[in-house]
Amino acid sequence: MVFEYDVLVIGGGHAGCEAASAAAKTGAKTCLITMDMNKIAQMSCNPAVGGIAKGQIVREIDALGGEMGHITDATAIQFRMLNRSKGPAMWSPRAQCDREKYILEWRTTLDQIPLLDILQDQAEELLVKDSKVLGIKTLWGIEIHAKATVVTAGTFLNGLMHIGHKMVEGGRIAEPAVHHFSESIARHGIRVARMKTGTPVRIDKRSVHFEEMEEQLGENDYHQFSYFGKQHTLPQLPCWTCATNAKVHEILRQGLADSPLYNGQINSIGPRYCPSIETKLVTFPDRDSHPLFLEPEGTDTNEMYLNGFSSSMPWDIQLEALHHIPALRDAKIYRPGYAIEYDFFDPTQLKHSLESKLIEGLFFAGQVNGTTGYEEAAGQGLVAGINAANFCANSEPFVMKRDESYIGVLIDDLTTKGVDEPYRMFTSRAEYRILLRQDDADARLTEKGYHLGLASRARYDWWLQKKEHIERIINFCEQTTVRPEEINNLLETVGTSPLRGTTRLSELVARPQLNFQNLSEKLPSLKEAIALSPNRTQEIAEAAEARMKYKGYIERERIFADKMRRLEDIRIAGHFHYAEMHDLSTECRQKLERIQPETLAEASRIPGVSPSDINVLLVLMGR
């Protein structure tokens, strides 16, 4: 039996769901194949979305017309804006979600997309002819043919789980691994390697002594992920904090010989910024304690996630260590922590569209590209889905630049630098952080999403209305003057220099000690101007305030970004045989030959390519 589609998406995780949704919504007849339709968009690790830089990615997905933002809002059981101690440019939203409701919301969303079919089966073999993808053969013997195929298989490709000395093949606990599929891809010259990740123990909340823990409440203000969706409506639940201690560390150290990470059982590299508890002990031997966060998995379950206690040690050692934490002295666990090794593919063999450089019509997204995190996966999935649909329609690839989005930074890092450990996004990876704020993803991307056919007309109209009100507030502040007697009492209270004469309101807004909230208390006209916005009043005010506070920084970053854009316009793909260019350094020749960057800007970001190497290429290009 053979099924025919425009786009085939393999894997129903966070990357696959966004890819399938994007492809179908932009006009491609799409099939999403997954091993278990009841575990679509499963949160395999922490039931949370967002965080530092990750929250910005989710807002970018939403601004383009993707699904993750509004689904997170609909299933959030605790919301917080991180980094509030820093300026608004560094703020990052994060939400704790109800795991089961998140899956149901995703399934409901996908079921309502007209051009999307979901099939429960397993990819067994990639079908390729003349370096062009044809589709796949499945475990049950059918063939699915497609003009474009997107691989979003997560940790399932030759997945191997570890708890102590026990090793079990699987892509997730109690779910089978996928064999043979990696090999069917690798035989076409695509490089495959191994990575490792892990997850903590899950605890029965009825066995926890919460009186021994510190409660951590969420925030109930106007912030959310979606620029267009409804606000979160589920009951908001607290998280709880505690810490390990010297006795816990002693028990864990005694068990290091049984840890797969230290007995030679696991050789793959795990995520640097989400280490296991045993790795923390080895890396920071002088630390007496490490913080732990007990987080609810939903409103209708007793299951709780112990953030900070990822481990692959034997079950009995994990449990004994937990019992020496006062709040967890009687803890009962649903399942222990475990590690998992899995296959990934070298992302430097991808174009910025996430299409393979070796097989036409084949796209990769998510953990199979060497990333870690739901948000990173979803962002890649969205781009891969858009480009798979564009490929079918013979349209230009959709590529986001580093000054346009964190998703653009992510994909550029993957395709030009590659990975030697699971890649996680941080604000520090972006050189244009002021341009990539969480408050302005709609300003950067909603128009693009609308023209792609992904963002709805209603969403686009709302953005145009919001933009009008942001500019109205900014114009009001630039045209309104403030006298010293109106404001100096406030300036003295907040510790900033008083006015000596009449000053424009926009100049006061730019001061770090001042904001719309405290200024509105002294200036009724500002309060009235803000209130004129018809809805999402506070969100609009926040965006206007951020643009005024960072005006100078925004202008400087834009000038620098425009200079770099000139290098982006100089295409070098196919122009050179790098191995023969002896004016370049040896390392440069090797890297350029292996990665084959498409533009001079991409070449400049490859580790080992120096400014002098770029100058040589510029001269050879006649620039």
Residue ranges and their predicted role:
Residues 21-125, 140, 152-172, 176, ...:
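Conserved N-terminal/central alpha/beta ligand/cofactor-binding core
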Residues 305-371, 399-412, 537-591, 596:
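A glycine-rich dinucleotide-binding beta-alpha-beta segment and adjacent secondary-structure elements
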Residues 2-15:
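Beta1/beta-strand and adjacent pyrophosphate-binding region of the FAD-binding site
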Residues 3-5, 139-148:
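Core beta-strand elements of the Rossmann-like FAD/NAD(P) dinucleotide-binding domain
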Residues 36-38, 54, 81, 183-319, ...:
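An anion/pyrophosphate-binding glycine-rich loop and adjacent beta-alpha core
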Residues 429, 435, 446-615, 619-623:
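Extended, charge-enriched "interface" segments that sit outside catalytic cores
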Residues 127-143:
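Conserved beta-strand-loop-beta-strand element in the redox core of flavoprotein oxidoreductases
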Residues 10, 143-154:
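Short hydrophobic core segments
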